Amino acid sequence: MKALMVRTDFSLGESALKAENAVKIARDAGYTAVISADSMNIASVIPLQRAAGDDMAVICGVKLNVVDDPTYEHRARLAKESERCMESLVRDRSYCFTALIKNEQGYRDVCELMTLANKREQFYFVPRLALDQLAAAYAKGNIILLTSDIGSVFQRRDFAKIIGTLVTAGGRDNFYSVVYPHPTPFYDQINVRAMKVASALKIEPVAFYPAYYEAVDDADIKDIAHMVTNNIKIDQPHRLRIPHQRDNAVNGRRHLLEALKAFSVRMDVPVTAAMASTTQDTIIEACTWRWHELPPALPKMADDEPATLMKLAVAGLRKRLTTKEFGYTPPASEHRVYVDRLKYEMDTLTRLGFCGYFLMVRDLMNHSRETGIPVGPGRGSSAGSLVAWCIGITNVDPIRHGLLFERFINPERLDLPDADLDFSQARRHEVIEYLNERYGEDYVAGIPNFTYLGAASALRDTARIYGVDAADMAVSKEFKNLEDDSLSLEELREQLASLDKYATKYPEAFKAACKLQSLMRGFGRHAAGMIVAGVPLVERTPVELRGNARCIAFDKRYCEAMGLIKLDVLGLATLDLLDSAKRYIKESTGEDINLDAIPLDDRKVLDGFAAGYTQGVFQLESGPMRKLLKDLGGGIEPMSFKTVVATTALFRPGPIQSGMLDDYVSVAKGFMAPQSLHPVLDELTAETNGVILYQEQTMNATRLLAGFTMAEADGVRKAIGKKDMEKMKSMGEKFVVQAQAGWIDVEMEDGTTQRIHRAEHFKCEDGALRTVEEALEAGVKLPMAAVRVTGSQPGLSETKAKEIWDAFEKNGAYQFNKSHPVAYSLISYQSMWLKTHYPAEFFAAALTILGEDKHQGLVKDALTYGIHVLPPDVNVSSNRIEIRTLEDGSQVLYAPFSAVKGCSENGCQAIMRAREKVGGKFESLEQFEEAVEKRACACNSRVRESLQKVGAFASIEPGSLPATDPERLRDQAELMGNLVIDAVKASRPFEMNPKRSAEVNVLMTRMAAEMGLGDDLIRPSIGIKPKIMVILDNANGNDGRTGYFMENGYDDFKAKLLTAGDLRMGDLYVTGVCKKVKDKEKDYTKDEIGQFTDFMREEINLVRPTYVLTCGSRATSLFNNKSKPSDLVGRKEYLPELDVTVFYGFNPNILYFRPEEGEKLEAILAEVAETISK
């Protein structure tokens, strides 16, 4: 046998060889075995083994880092020793060994070693072992140790002693001294030492020529991968170069033999051909362990898990059938449907061995509810399970909403279930803590994320290390507009002229990006994924450290293959919002609101959706979504819960781009009739206006029209969704054939008749699948009480069957799992119900829970409900929003003390303690000063001054301005940020006298000279009496014709300025950041943008505008670079350092491409007009 030793891209920055490709490359080079030896990582063994087949042996190895004392840094931190002390300690450098797994126990030994190296006490930038830990594992005889290459033990002065320790511990039979015969002085010295040790300790020498990339030309790519991983630029003077590793390509065995012989001659060291042949074979034959899939390992939840689950499910179903949930109790006539579905699901779960999983998830949900942790009604496909509903995992009735169990679990395949669970975002950590306490830390861990370089990230990362201008690098942003995200950079170059231009300008950077695409970029941690195992995790996987969290070594793609079942434990802030609102309601009314009992046909709530009053409502708060809801609210059918569900499923890029959303809205408004392909399909798509929107619709259609089993229907869903052309072809052919078979009328024992598809198969009493006709002929009992066939109906024509299948394929990639939008729309509905019936409590909770970027919109929206948000009041406010009802019955919300800049939680508590100390109310400012703590960490003079400025003391300070007085607005805008929605009225005029105009001209002349713009400079257009400065991102062709911004063109924008903003050109000072028309052949350079920006800041300081309207991301970033410019659109901000109110807009050129954005611009300009006219 011939073995190729490889290091894959799982060794970050050390290899440019993809694990998925390594086996094929080795096979093509004539090898029959691959030895993987990644740095402290064995995850590559799964893709290697899956690619290997039966003709290639994959030996799993790992390069282990060893240091003298891996716990030193941890102990030093605990002892609070200084960094200087740590750095001054004389310590020997780390070194490495490569361990090869011989058998099953050897795999566990390696898992334990790597878990040990990843413990917090030993992890320091990288996982590390102590020599005695390695020796103890080696002594068991289950692994083979090889000396390593870079970082080899032979670089240590005491290498002989170290190797002697290991040989003494485990014997010399499993220890090999390795020669890597690279023709470099470094390796010559290392290899001579390796041969001397082998001779002295009677250790077998062996030779390998490890591969870290495919071809010799790829040596630079490995170097670049290292720079990308370590954030090093290619022209950095001291960047790490590794010349002795520049021939680690995949070479044939002859290359190894020739290199070994050359080493022998060069260094006068005797070698044998056996080192590259029989000794390798001995190692390969000794390593019999191969990675293989493992059975599921779940905690044992009961002695008889199926019986326990059945008992719980039956009890739960009895309760559900007699309890009104979301305004609905299943009628008695449907109870048999629920019972039959429960039996079917339980049979499936029992047969597949998933009962324990359901019990485990139920236990977690029950614990959360019992401890008051808010949980969601469901998420993803698990909402389609009746058993999950019965035992309290979900709160979605799948039969009421037409959801399918098979979308969650395919009864014909052992696909492990994957439940997505929503919990309070604020208390999610308690859920994780419970899992660790309940099952033990050794059984619970997170899941890592393996991130890969896609086309855009490969281009950006290589551009960064090559020092490419940021403006040129921006070409990568165009990739996201393409439908196919699997294209290579070479293929993208053929489609995008801008990328071809980039590749021509930066050929080396582009070539490197092409080579790097799809390589591993880094390791992270899955945001929600958790593993709970029934065996110690170390028996199946190393447990690694990702940040401060423990993770298994294999990502979510491989969990199932390792028999490890994933739970997604997600945090959802809206659950905190709902819980907070309920607590406010309890305080104000004494009511305990049960949001799971509210009816889904509340007309007031549905009218709120139809009017687009969804600011702050889960999933539905964006401007375009609110507009869509208004459109649907004006339709021929009244708004319903089903409409809300469909809207959330449709409002995604796929359905929008494909035209599905437009068709749905057009049918809803009566502009077109729904598409009709067949009465069966018409009935299935009636709830979605004839649009095949849900995957469940396609699954049901294949069963009803072509007799597919639900498991086959799920296969259709998967194949179409993943664009598996081969499966789609075979399933399409089957659909067309079976759809022509037609239906039969079957008489039942009770005298009724059912119409059943002739090709539909049912599980009979003997366990076999048969059609009704086959079962009746064989005399075998069917699951239904069928007596005989009484008639038949013809099937579809071949043409019609093909037409329907084509419709499935066309929309299949954009169809959505109905279970998810149903479950999440329940949360949206609960949010809207609270907002409709308890608006003050809703807004108080929303302002407490949701991010500051949402505050302005919420405060503005609260006003439409007659609710004002007021500054803090020392006699009312606390560390949260407080609700008060005024004498006229209106409600107001008092901001918390912490809403004022500089007032911390300590400050809030200090004021509240002082207020309690004086009887619950301050009578005067003097009493406040006397009672409150004034320590630096509590309520110091600066905090008190800020509180006084915003009006917090107005109620106890006679003669002071009321908190709502407009004179306080400037201070409130400065100190309370987004809770203030009124624009600050200018306290000074916007003066553009002849002197200042002349100064602007001087600045422009200096800019033209310093930047070499000459006549290309585009100057500001200065109105006769400007009221506002309008800042564009850059000049366009219209500006270039006149040499001034906006003197020509911009017709749509000017019309909006006039009609919505009451602004004429004489009222404007129009300028732009980049004062040159962009060259058609190239974008602005990074340096040009920097210079333009600096001059723009100078211009703002010189002109001193009172109001500014930004029209683009560059303009917006001049004033706020903390938020994304797109998130700031429609907001305003007072900047005290400039004494200016900034209204954030967007590039007016968008109006040419998206006229619908005009409504948003009009709203911004109306606010500008209202502010200026005050």
From Swiss-Prot:
Belongs to the DNA polymerase type-C family. DnaE subfamily. Its main location: cytoplasm. DNA polymerase III contains a core (composed of alpha, epsilon and theta chains) that associates with a tau subunit. This core dimerizes to form the PolIII' complex. PolIII' associates with the gamma complex (composed of gamma, delta, delta', psi and chi chains) and with the beta chain to form the complete DNA polymerase III complex. InterPro entries: DNA_pol3_alpha_NTPase_dom, DNA_pol3_finger, DnaE2/DnaE/PolC, DNAPol_HHH, PHP_dom, Pol/His_phosphatase_N, Uracil-DNA_glycosylase-like_sf. It holds the Pfam family PHP. It is an enzyme of class 2 (transferase). It catalyses: DNA(n) + a 2'-deoxyribonucleoside 5'-triphosphate = DNA(n+1) + diphosphate. It comes from Yersinia pestis. This is DNA polymerase III subunit alpha. One of its GO terms (biological process) is DNA replication.
